[in-house]
């Protein structure tokens, strides 16, 4: 009997801060009063030290909850906002996750359906056997101030682990079309998307192209629209999902919430994010139909299984939504996105050059937060060194790798530094002790003044350490985030 192919696990990540759309409208109403119609709810916004890579790492960690990472055989990262044009972005994610060196990694880009297209390819490869494949999608798009999309977009990431075995959702098949329909585009030199007229996009693209693909796809898959229990349309434009459901004969109740009011449209990540959201509440035996749109259409059909109940708890979409903090500081967000040039002072002029030689030698220490544990005494330390720091046994060559990224820690000391430069002053940092041993002088992120205190439990998150603006190079490291 052939093993079933499908989704083995899923996860998600949404940034903590939620910019109120009313704040965006209030700042731009003098120039663009028409934004009032979009000024309800909130959208996710990444912190200054987040990008598609850091968000993908967090979504991957969530996806791999309870999974032996050594079993992962391939990794793909889909996004149209990857920070490096000629450096494997998925390779950085691989290092942060401490996946085996023998894993294959791939960046997928160029279209808003890059996430679903990468997922289809991974599922087809998995059907032929082999190790599970980790599919990640993340997006952090810039939007021109006072534009509609400034309120519509959101930042986020999602992950799916696919392979053979006992999937939580069996893959039943897919259908795809490719058409150079330009609803929007962004050239290599542009910071912002150029978007075409909304009604034409809705009528010709959403209702026309997706509608036709749904009809053909359902027929090719041998499924009636009425049999679909969860219908995922990753578009937040009002009425589009309902219209497509009616056109395909799918019950209106099957339409999955596109998270427009609380998240926004997270681009390439949105189909996978909504799929993760649907799986969080799905029951066994439900048929889930997923749409991807961008210069064509992807249609994917899944059927959930009883394995859903066996998944260990995870943050997921629901947990990410629950940790949100309302934010109405529009100017700060513009500054973090590089759209507002503030006087930063001489301390911001320090050269942040990263020697590639040093990063290569210490990639596990820096990107993977891998410390060392003495095999004779059990003493844990960070960083790992040739000589153990054990009090009574300074053994040489006795340490083994000891990953610390998923180990909780406790704040021992801290300071709020208003002199050093940081895009979110003051700069919080201090000493933390990991459970079971190991101490690190860490920066704190996603914190307010009341969040940092001695004895507070923290976890670690992969973030941007600094940006070498002279060479346009991003340095990554791990930062502490309060738990609870």
Can you say where each PLM-predicted feature lies in the sequence?
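Short, acidic/hydrophobic/Gly-rich beta-strand patch recurrent on exposed beta strands
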Residues: 429-435, 443, 479-480
């Amino acid at each position: 009997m052939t093993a079933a192919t499908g989704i083995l696990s899923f996860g998600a990540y949404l940034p903590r801060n939620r910019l109120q759309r009313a704040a965006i409208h209030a700042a731009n109403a003098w120039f663009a009063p028409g934004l009032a119609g979009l000024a309800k709810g909130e959208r996710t916004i990444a912190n200054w030290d987040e990008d598609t890579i850091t968000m993908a790492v967090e979504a991957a960690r969530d996806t791999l909850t309870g999974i032996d990472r050594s079993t992962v055989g391939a990794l793909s990262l889909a996004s149209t906002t990857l920070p490096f044009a000629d450096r494997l972005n998925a390779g950085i994610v691989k290092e942060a996750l401490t996946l085996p060196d023998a894993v294959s990694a791939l960046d997928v880009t160029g279209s808003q359906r890059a996430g679903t297209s990468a997922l289809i390819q991974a599922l087809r490869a998995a059907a032929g056997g082999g190790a599970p494949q980790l599919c990640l999608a993340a997006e952090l798009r810039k939007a021109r101030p006072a534009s509609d999309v400034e309120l519509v977009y959101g930042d986020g990431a999602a992950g799916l682990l696919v392979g053979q075995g006992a999937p939580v959702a069996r893959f039943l098949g897919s259908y795809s079309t490719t058409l150079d329909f330009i609803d929007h585009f962004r050239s290599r030199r542009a910071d912002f998307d150029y978007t075409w007229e909304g009604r034409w996009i809705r009528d010709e693209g959403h209702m026309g192209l997706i509608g036709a693909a749904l009809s053909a796809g359902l027929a090719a898959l041998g499924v009636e629209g009425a049999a679909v229990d969860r219908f995922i349309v990753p578009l937040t434009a009002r009425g589009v999902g309902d219209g497509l459901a009616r056109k395909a004969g799918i019950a209106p109740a099957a339409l999955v919430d596109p998270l427009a009011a609380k998240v926004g449209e997270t681009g390439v990540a949105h189909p996978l994010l909504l799929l993760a959201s649907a799986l969080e509440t799905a029951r066994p035996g439900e048929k889930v139909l997923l749409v991807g749109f961008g210069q064509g259409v992807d249609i994917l059909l899944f059927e959930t299984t009883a394995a859903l109940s066996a998944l260990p708890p995870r943050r997921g979409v629901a947990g990410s939504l629950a940790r949100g903090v309302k934010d109405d500081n529009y100017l700060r967000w513009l500054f973090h996105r590089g759209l507002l040039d503030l006087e930063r002072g001489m301390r911001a002029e320090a050269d942040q050059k990263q020697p590639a030689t040093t990063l290569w030698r210490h990639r596990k220490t820096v990107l993977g937060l891998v410390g060392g544990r003495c095999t004779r005494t059990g003493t844990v330390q960070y960083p790992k060194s040739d000589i153990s720091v054990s009090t009574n046994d300074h053994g040489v060559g006795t340490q083994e790798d000891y990953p610390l990224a998923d180990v909780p820690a406790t704040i021992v000391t801290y300071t709020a530094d208003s002199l050093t430069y940081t895009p979110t002053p003051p700069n919080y940092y201090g000493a933390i002790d990991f459970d079971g041993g190991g101490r690190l002088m860490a920066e704190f992120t996603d914190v307010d003044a009341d969040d940092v205190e001695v004895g507070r439990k923290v976890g670690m998150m992969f973030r941007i350490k600094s940006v070498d603006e002279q060479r346009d190079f991003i340095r990554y490291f791990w930062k502490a985030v309060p738990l609870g």
